């Protein structure tokens, strides 16, 4: 288990791929804190020693990119001890997070990227062996094959777990997702308005599979 072999583990991935749920389920023995909470962030920034007294290792810090100064404190802790599995960090802003990690925890952290559900997970197919070009492998895999009755439904829903846990309308889900993405992620990185960014997303989505042409996208956005 790489988590137990590393002093610090970072789990990154898009919002709503259930990073926190996975970590809480698999590592329930870890203490937990979340930097979505402003008071928690203030304490971590202004009184880091007290923060770690209140939140001892092993510790899971969610949305860690929201208070990047804590990474220097984590660096000191992991450098002073040979104990493994001290920290699990997670966050949704990959660019901002990786910048902080490269500056403070380079060579000290194992990085995992959690994607959305695969087709096997969506269809609850238990067969998960790595591909091997042999007849035995193909025969074994064939016993687990399932028919994809409505591939368009899968395309529209995408791979976010929430859309398969409950009967959630996918249009409502993605509308809320874009709004949250704008308010909580994009606006922290660049100054833009919601209409312009929505037009950008639409222009890029309409060109899926095409060669990237910045001029055409800029023309659509106006």
Where in the sequence are the language-model features?
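Pre-Walker A adenine-sensing motif
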Residues: 1-4
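Hydrophobic anchor at the beta1->P-loop junction of P-loop NTPases
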Residues: 11
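Conserved lysine of the Walker
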Residues: 19-20
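Short glycine-rich substrate-engagement loop in P-loop NTPases that contacts/grips substrate
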Residues: 30-58
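Conserved catalytic/switch belt of AAA+ P-loop NTPases
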Residues: 71-95, 99-104
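Short regulatory helix/loop adjacent to the ATP-binding pocket of P-loop NTPases
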Residues: 95-111, 123-128
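Interdomain hinge/linker elements that couple catalytic modules in large macromolecular machines
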Residues: 124-222
